[in-house]
């Protein structure tokens, strides 16, 4: 385990913005995780657990220790009704999904090509095309940072919500996800109700056909972070009450939304697109011309460029629809997590 000093974070997050960390260490075992968090030299320093860095924006140089989760490995078991997959927290999520499909195991195909690591999936309760992580989760293994004990949380204990979980609330900064357990039924049912997936002919429906379709759509609509720096969907799809929805529907008949329990989930990309932000650029930051929900590092942008562009979008959407957008991307300051509203006050 090598502890690096004053290291560039550009290769460690998909926005690929030049920023540095005072310390950085890549850990390949739980013992190494414990060593870092128990190290008296680092005790008072802020720490940030990072997977593939696909959902973060570093707004300042990080003054503490960035801990990169490299825990790897996966195992497969089964009984008469289910497949069970145990994946270490540093396992690449897109590779895990593809591996399952290649094994003939269905259930994860709708979650194909979502960047990130297995350990990040429960924190964010990742989701796409009608499936969320909570739908396939059996358990999440965590390392508690106060006494370094290991716990196994059931899916219910994870308190999953829309892009939300207990790891953002009661367990925030209290633990590290070291592994996840997935439970996938052998009696596979296609989840093809969303948009382009309906184009697949019924006789061709399979985990593999849905996997390929999801990959095709994502590659067509979303920029490859290896080519253009980005963190995927920058904003969450806002959830509003039905009274507000009905007012907007009367004024904007083409508004795109879906039921979310007793409320409505509005397509943030549609809202941003209707405010004419596709292709808009601030400094080196740009709203992707094909997908308004994605902000990109188009030309060696700074974090401030992204912040200013995101602020303009939030203001425009509020002025037109009275909907407050919430960013899905995590903003990381010099000492830890912050948010757009705090940064706007500071600037």
From Swiss-Prot:
Positions of disulphide bridges: none
GO BP: cell division; cell wall organization; peptidoglycan biosynthetic process; regulation of cell shape
GO-annotated cellular components: cytosol
Pathway where this protein functions: Cell wall biogenesis; peptidoglycan biosynthesis
CC cofactor: FAD
Role of this protein: Cell wall formation.
Name the record gives this protein: UDP-N-acetylenolpyruvoylglucosamine reductase
Species this chain originates from: Vibrio vulnificus (strain YJ016)
